[in-house]
Amino acid sequence: MARPRKSSGRMASKGFPNPIDVHVGSRIRLRRTLLGMSQERLAEAIGLTFQQVQKYERGANRVGSSRLFDLAKVLDVPVSYFFEDMSPGVQDKTPSKLMGLAHPPA
């Protein structure tokens, strides 16, 4: 009997990118363009193809923690930069909130 496939967590629902991945990608693009850096140059600096950088910036592919750390170093920002200015609508779509597991701040 085949085992059920475990969700990768990449898509929020119905094939749409996770809103947090889209936000992180938009912050990567913002910082890259503020530095006047091309996708090709950023990709080369972190050992990827420019197509992969495009996918990160669109939120189509999730950025892993070690890759996010590398991006932060190359783009000269703290890792937290990628999560700044996140709209409440995006924050409300986190899995723990969707499942009712998050506790409101005290």
For each predicted feature, which ranges?
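Conserved hydrophobic/aromatic packing and binding residues within compact polymer-binding modules
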Residues: 28, 42-43, 53-56, 82
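Alpha-helical residues within the helix-turn-helix
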Residues: 33, 44, 73
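Short basic helix-loop element that most often maps to the first helix and adjoining turn
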Residues: 26-41
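Interfacial/linker helices and their anchor residues that mediate assembly or domain coupling
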Residues: 90-106
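Short C-terminal boundary/hinge segments that cap the last helix of small helical domains
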Residues: 76-93
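Short, basic-rich loop-to-helix N-cap that marks the start of a DNA-contacting helix
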Residues: 60-70
